[in-house]
Amino acid sequence: MDLRDFYLLAALIACLRLDSAIAQELIYTIREELPENVPIGNIPKDLNISHINAATGTSASLVYRLVSKAGDAPLVKVSSSTGEIFTTSNRIDREKLCAGASYAEENECFFELEVVILPNDFFRLIKIKIIVKDTNDNAPMFPSPVINISIPENTLINSRFPIPSATDPDTGFNGVQHYELLNGQSVFGLDIVETPEGEKWPQLIVQQNLDREQKDTYVMKIKVEDGGTPQKSSTAILQVTVSDVNDNRPVFKEGQVEVHIPENAPVGTSVIQLHATDADIGSNAEIRYIFGAQVAPATKRLFALNNTTGLITVQRSLDREETAIHKVTVLASDGSSTPARATVTINVTDVNDNPPNIDLRYIISPINGTVYLSEKDPVNTKIALITVSDKDTDVNGKVICFIEREVPFHLKAVYDNQYLLETSSLLDYEGTKEFSFKIVASDSGKPSLNQTALVRVKLEDENDNPPIFNQPVIELSVSENNRRGLYLTTISATDEDSGKNADIVYQLGPNASFFDLDRKTGVLTASRVFDREEQERFIFTVTARDNGTPPLQSQAAVIVTVLDENDNSPKFTHNHFQFFVSENLPKYSTVGVITVTDADAGENKAVTLSILNDNDNFVLDPYSGVIKSNVSFDREQQSSYTFDVKATDGGQPPRSSTAKVTINVMDVNDNSPVVISPPSNTSFKLVPLSAIPGSVVAEVFAVDVDTGMNAELKYTIVSGNNKGLFRIDPVTGNITLEEKPAPTDVGLHRLVVNISDLGYPKSLHTLVLVFLYVNDTAGNASYIYDLIRRTMETPLDRNIGDSSQPYQNEDYLTIMIAIIAGAMVVIVVIFVTVLVRCRHASRFKAAQRSKQGAEWMSPNQENKQNKKKKRKKRKSPKSSLLNFVTIEESKPDDAVHEPINGTISLPAELEEQSIGRFDWGPAPPTTFKPNSPDLAKHYKSASPQPAFHLKPDTPVSVKKHHVIQELPLDNTFVGGCDTLSKRSSTSSDHFSASECSSQGGFKTKGPLHTRQCNSHSKSDNIPVTPQKCPSSTGFHIQENEESHYESQRRVTFHLPDGSQESCSDSGLGDHEPVGSGTLISHPLPLVQPQDEFYDQASPDKRTEADGNSDPNSDGPLGPRGLAEATEMCTQECLVLGHSDNCWMPPGLGPYQHPKSPLSTFAPQKEWVKKDKLVNGHTLTRAWKEDSNRNQFNDRKQYGSNEGHFNNGSHMTDIPLANLKSYKQAGGATESPKEHQL
């Protein structure tokens, strides 16, 4: 109903006339170009047939049949059961339907059709007139894309020149409505003149004076528009040529001329002679005749115009029936200004040249051109509808219709020129079995023309034979999605009887609810829309029964196969497919199968699958739907993949559908737990003895990147808790104290914690070491870390919770043995040396002493050079060791901890942190005169105890400290050497200082200026870690250039590598409190020498830059008693006395030590790594920032002025020339004795 309301402009206009209650007329109005199946009208509703049925008491079902010629393509169709009128697939084009006709009004374009209503008891003949309204389906067009106009240059302003008008096949408001001059110039304008016939002619107006010499051509665009919706338009190029002057224009004698010419006029017949005059002379008076642009192309084809004479002639045969009136516009132009215009109307008169036409349309369907009637059929049985027509007009078009000979049939007039063929009397089969007669149609022209149509009628006998179907099994095929009332086939049966006995009635059997069968004709139609997906085949029976008495019948099987159409899109079994695969699935493994169905058949159900979204991670088999992976899955990187799958069938056009696919990657337990806390396997937690049971003493925390149970972690202590002192929460990882610590529990406890996930079928685990130090305080951090390092060599299954004390006792025993052995060796060496010295002759000693005394008092450069030459010739001892402290210790068998036996190389930051930590105690004053020569002092310390004192409350280190300090002759004095790696000095400087790492603990009180190492971090709160300085293996304290002190002596101590702690902790006592306001220095009193005197070094052992070498002597200069000479003695011993070289056994040179790093800790960039333990277990070392280490190593505790050297802060200087006791700034006691290290 909506479509009808939309397209149908007017429903039922009128019921024009009823003739004998059987002829009625309906008028409908529709738009052209309607699509198929648009309802036009409803015959029973519009005629109110249901009321008529009720009045007459008729209850039989009515059949509506469109009466049409065989082979015609109907523009409309009529439902046989409902009487509804619909459009067909044949497009109704108003311009084509009414081509060549001139209509004053839009509604004059129409077509007619007839519909009969059966059965005969309620016969109706319905004449339907359908008026076709115009739609704007054509754009107006100019006759040519380029329009040329010539205008004289002397044309006056506002002169008008006609422009060929555009044509539009549409009519009314859909036709040409408006002209517009585009990109026109101000020289011209445009005006529209409307003719009495309603045509619109454009005219070009000259708005400015023209000058051909300045510009002879103007090119513009002209646009034409119609008034339809949507509006259509077109454009053309308008080219104006300015021509030379021509004063007078041609003039027609008659502007409007009307002529008549018969339609049978031969070719060449003159229609009219036009004549125009021109007042000019010569060439300006030459007139040329042309057709105007408004002349239709069909008219130009029928008539010819002589361009010179103006004669119009017939050039093709005329047909009044096609076009009765031709309007011709003729222009007369002399090539100058506006041409003259004349309109010629040519009326084509009719002649009787067309015979009548008979349109015979059967009401009773003929069989092979023959109408079968029963001999008992009543009178006035309607056989056919006959329509006669003649294309001629007036008398020539008046037609009469009659039957040629006497037969029991007659024609009954229904409308003008329309008749019904009926039986005029009862039929007698026994009298005549068959009738064949002609229907004649004749016009009234002179001479008269006629037309005939042959009608065959056969009568049927009594019923003695049953009807027989032509085919016992009728097989049909029909496409699904058909329309209701679709004609399928005509089921026919024959009966050898005649008359009533041969009148066959068809009836459907059971299981035929989808079909309608015409009882009379056997026309089988579809009463419903078929759906092949619901039912593909219908099998039912059709019964043909005659009207005999008794009636006879027969049956035929009808098999209707429904053909498939692609009306079903592929359907996925799920709108969203979800597949679950395990991670680490190999590449090209099957992930899942996409299932899709299509209810169609054949190619329409051939489904092809494809992946959308350009997903390259998966491969989809387009036919089987198997999804295979193109990658290996890793759930930790991506847990799911989502893409769309498209299914396309093979129909035309193809149909498709999509579904969503999600690939969920199931977790596989392929990741071990990762320890977050503790940050490393070498950190520790302090457990005070006052801790109460149940308190948390440490926290173990780990994460697992897997999910589900694979990420659920369980914490257990697998080793190190044999006493049951600690308990770990299996869920949180918190380590709590089970019972209050006893004194026997004091020490380092190593707990091996196993962190395992709950993965199935295989659980993964990680081991981590948790060190708990049970004590009231953790004052000596280096001691604790040394214990931790020792435990790294211990198998994980061994308990070391109380192993610190045995290590300590063992170290004390080792130290004592080493001290006793060292003392015995020194005593033996001294004894042997004394014996060797005593062998020298007294005479040789006296002479040498006299000579050396002279040089002592007044040394000269020449003697020094000579002695240097002698010293070069003589093999001097190469075994003298540089002044250094050697610390030997054993490290774990680790890639990071290598055995260390070498000299400590301190970076700049360690120097800054270490120097100034300790006071050296009172410095003895020098006893040498100013500018006196400096005797080399030889040191040999083989004391069984270290050369420095430990505070009583300092715990003894578990390391084995073996300290040996040697000062050979050539390395006694420290000069301003730039390269510290030389480990020797070439000149004297003002001050002697020494420093060590955690093992030495030496510190000066004044600020020192040290070299900087760029690789060190300057952060105060970061533990000092070893970094490589590019050019130094030791440390060196620079000289204060502005020092006002007198010449002094500097002694530099080179310590072997081995400290693993920064200088924040001496390693020999308690650590300094963090944030202490004042620096706590540990005085390091030097051990008094065994005797008051010392031996002087020979002058030839000194370097050129040597100065005073005895800042500590307090007695007058003079030789001491000479001991017995040894084989190592020289002549200098007679004067100066014996030196250490006389009795010193050969040793390692100062450079013959292995180079080792300062610390066994890995650099910061290597702090996260795996360490292998003794038993093969792997520990995760994640050195971040250990709170314990930071507690002991915070650089802030050293004061803000550390590491800077300026004029305002001086080092402690000891004048060499002052013979009095020197008192340090710290107020230490005086000491005139020599301090021996």
Curated annotation (Swiss-Prot):
Domain called Cadherin: residue spans: 26-142, 143-252, 253-358, 365-469, 470-572, 573-675, 679-784
InterPro entries, A to Z: Cadherin-like_dom (IPR002126), Cadherin-like_sf (IPR015919), Cadherin_CS (IPR020894), Cadherin_N (IPR013164), Protocadherin (IPR013585), Protocadherin/Cadherin-CA (IPR050174)
GO molecular function, one term: calcium ion binding
Record membrane topology: Single-pass type I membrane protein
Residue ranges, Extracellular side: 24-814
Keywords: Calcium, Cell adhesion, Cell membrane, Glycoprotein, Membrane, Repeat, Signal, Transmembrane, Transmembrane helix
Compositionally skewed regions (Basic and acidic residues) per UniProt: 1186-1197
Protein name: Protocadherin-9
Organism encoding this protein: Homo sapiens
